[in-house]
Amino acid sequence: MITVSNLAIQFGKKPLFQDVNLKFTPGNCYGVIGANGAGKSTMLRLISGDLASTKGSVTLGPGERLSVLKQNHYDYEESTVLNAVLMGHIELWNIIQEKDTLYAKADFSDKDGMRAAELEERFAEMDGWNAESDAAMLLSGLGIKEDYHHRLMKELGGKEKVRVLLAQALFGKPDNLLLDEPTNDLDLDTVMWLENYLGNYENTVLVVSHDRHFLDAVSTHTVDIDFGKVQLFAGNYSFWYHSSQLALRQQQNQNKKAEEKKKELLEFIARFSANVAKSKQTTSRKKMIEKLNIEDIQPSTRKYPGIIFMPDREPGNRILEVKGLTKSINGEVLFKNLDFNIEKDDKVIFLSRDPRAMTALFEIITGHEKPDAGTYFWGQTITNAYLPMDNSDFFNSDLNLVDWLGQFSSDTSENYIRGYLGKMLFSGEEIYKKTTVLSGGEKMRCMISRMMLRNANVLVLDTPTNHLDLESIQAFNNTLTNFKGNVLMSSHDHEFIQTIASRVIELAPKGMIDKITEYDEYIANEELKDRRNKIY
C-alpha cells in the first residue's frame, strides 16, 4: 500500500502539482495518464524517492518492498542477465552474496557457521531456493531465450536490456510496483504476456503507458494529472475517457443554457428598468441572474493535433502487386517469396516476430532498399507517403521547423507552412525552433506534417505511434480509421491495430499468412496459431 499525503512539487517558481492526497491499495493497478510534461514520470519518481518533494510525504505499508522499472540500460553491463534480474530483490541478492562469500572462506569458523545458519533461514523464508527458476521464468515470458540467461548484459542489444530490467522490476513479486512505459520496445506477444501477468498481480501497481489497450487490460483505476491537479478515478482508461468527455459535454450544455437564460433576463431588465410598474419584476430577475451557475471550464493541458490526410485523387483498383519478394540481412532470412496484392480500401497490418521484416518490406516498396529477389508494382493512380521507424536522417540539418517542412512543400510561404505546423501543435515562436533540439515526439509530429503535405492515397507506416502521447495516438487513430485510401502499417499498439486494420499479413522466413480479418480474431484463431508457428 502507498499513501501520498499533501504532496507538492515545484520547479523554480512553477508548481507542477500540489496538495496531492491519494491512497494506492493492494490488488489494484493504477494507470497514470496526462499530457506530455504534466508530471506522470515525476509522480512515480516522487513515490519511489528518486526525487525529493517540495512538500508532503509518501509512505509504504509496514515492511513492504517497492520495486521500480529502471531506465538506465547500462547499469549492469558486467553482470549476467540472470543476476541482473536477481538484483531486483536487493535484500535477497545481498543474502546470496554474503552466503557465497562465507562458504568460500578457507577458514570457516563457528561464528561463520552461525551467521550462515541465520542467512539460510532468511533465504528460505524469501523462497530463495526458487529464485533462479522464478527469474528464468520471467525472462522467458518477456522473450529472453534461455541461451542468453548466463550471458553478460553488455552482450545484449538495447531492446533486450529493457526486457531484462522489466523482469528485474517484477522479480520477487514486490508489494508495490512502479512501471514507467513498460511496453516500450516490446512486441505484441510480449505485451500480451505482461497484460496477463499484471492482470493476476495481487499487490499494488502504478503504471505509466501510452498504450490504450494495455491500460484497459491492466488498470482497475486511473490517475489523471491535468490542470496541475492529480485526481483518482475508478475504472480503466476507456471508462475514464468516455466519462470525462460526457462530463465535459454536460457542463458545456449546462453553461450554454445558463448563458441563454442570462441573456434573456438581461434583455428584460434593459427593456423595463425605467418602468416603475415593472420594478419588482426587474429586481426579481436581477436576483435570478445572481443565482445562475455558470462554471468556468478550465482549458486542459491535453492538446489533440489536427491530423488530416486529404488524397489528391481516389485510388484505382490496382494498388500494389508484390511477386516473389525475398530479403535477408547478414544471411538471416526475413521473408521469402512474398506474393500478395493490395486491393482498394485495404488497411493492412503487417506482423512478424522479427520487426526487421516489416521495416525491410516497407523500405523496399517505397524504393529505399532493393530486394534480394522479386518485384513490386504500384498502380498508376497511386501516390504513397511513408513514415519510417527511424527518422534520424531527416533531422541532421540545423534548419528551423518552417524551413525544414518547406523542403517538402510546393508552396513554401510561411503562412502555408505555419498552418501545417499549427495542426501538429507547433505555435508561436516554436516554429523557429531548430530541428536538432526536437524531442522524439516532436520529430514524429514533424514527420506526420510532412506526410500530410503529400496528399497521398496510400500511407505506409512503420510503428507510427512511437514517441506519441495518448492524445496524438487517439487523433492519429481516428484519422486512419476514416481515411479514404489504403493503409499499410506495422505497430505494437493493439488498440491502434484492432480499430484500423481490416486485413492481416504475417511475414516469416518459411512463408506468410494473409487473412482478411480483424486482429483480435486473427490472434485468437487456434488453427492459425499452428500455422503461425510453422512459418518461423
Per-region residue spans from a language model:
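Short amphipathic coiled-coil heptad-repeat segments
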Residues: 136-142, 267-271, 287-292
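A structural signal for long alpha-helical coiled-coils and helix-turn connectors
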Residues: 103, 241, 270-273, 277, ...
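ABC ATPase nucleotide-binding domains
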Residues: 251-273, 278-287, 303, 524-536
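Extended non-transmembrane interhelical loops and adjacent amphipathic helices
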Residues: 113, 186, 283-294
